[in-house]
Curated annotation (Swiss-Prot):
Quaternary context: UreD, UreF and UreG form a complex that acts as a GTP-hydrolysis-dependent molecular chaperone, activating the urease apoprotein by helping to assemble the nickel containing metallocenter of UreC. The UreE protein probably delivers the nickel.
Protein name from the UniProt record: Urease accessory protein UreF
Predominant cellular place of this UniProt entry's protein: cytoplasm
Keywords: Chaperone, Cytoplasm, Nickel insertion
A single GO molecular function term of this UniProt record: nickel cation binding
Family statement drawn from the similarity comment of this UniProt entry: Belongs to the UreF family.
Length: 210
């Protein structure tokens, strides 16, 4: 395994200090309302977010960032695609923490940007295949949502791992498609997930930031 790939694995690890564990992407609201109540419903909810929501849009943005597209323009797109204030906060706060940590580790100048753009700028010099980077990013995103479900549904640890494993084929498909997708393909249709993010903003009792 190359040092470049190991660097990417480190950056996308749950141990990397982006604070990802504190964000549920609206999943906390869906769980509290009973929309997500077991492993099967958690898998469906996360799959929809991956295929039709932030998973796909972030993957396309990341692909273009890896290829050197204007980071300011991509950052503006990422902000515009955030369907709720908490979603914007999620991508900006994680992106800023990610960029600051990678900059401290590498000595590179990496300004704070939305997470997929920050990751793309950081990972571009690694020279890894675009679809491979996208797949690892999507896997980290899905794993974080599964972790939230394990803690809050709650699911058993084995159920959580089975849920994540069941998403692997979908993650590979989205990564392959998004690696070649133009920016014109950007868009979201994960309506229930977007509504959950909006409703979480006024949820009175919560343990997640989003």
């Amino acid at each position: 395994m190359s040092a470049a790939l190991l660097s990417l694995v480190q950056w996308l690890s749950p141990a990397f200090p982006t604070g990802a564990f504190a964000y549920s992407h609206g999943l906390e609201w869906a769980i509290s309302e009973g929309e997500v109540r077991d492993a099967a419903s958690a898998r469906r909810w996360i799959a929809d977010v991956l295929a039709f929501g932030a998973g796909r849009t972030d993957a396309i943005l990341l692909a273009h960032a890896l290829r050197g597209h204007d980071p300011e323009a991509l950052s503006d797109l990422a902000r515009a695609l955030a369907p709720a204030a908490e979603r914007l906060r999620e991508t900006e706060e994680q992106g800023a923490a990610f960029a600051a940590t990678v900059a401290a580790l590498t000595g590179r100048d990496l300004p704070p940007r939305p997470l997929p753009v920050a990751l793309g700028q950081a990972a571009a010099p690694l020279g890894l295949p675009v679809a491979e980077v996208l797949a690892l990013m999507l896997h980290a995103f899905a794993a974080n949502l599964v972790s939230a479900a394990v803690r809050f549904v709650p699911l058993g640890q084995t159920e959580g791992q089975a849920t994540l494993a069941a998403l692997h084929p979908l993650i590979g498909e989205i990564a392959a498609e998004s690696a070649e997708a133009p920016l014109d393909a950007l868009g979201s249709a994960a309506l229930r997930g977007d509504l959950a993010a909006m409703r979480h903003e006024t949820q009175e009792v919560r343990i997640f930031k989003t």
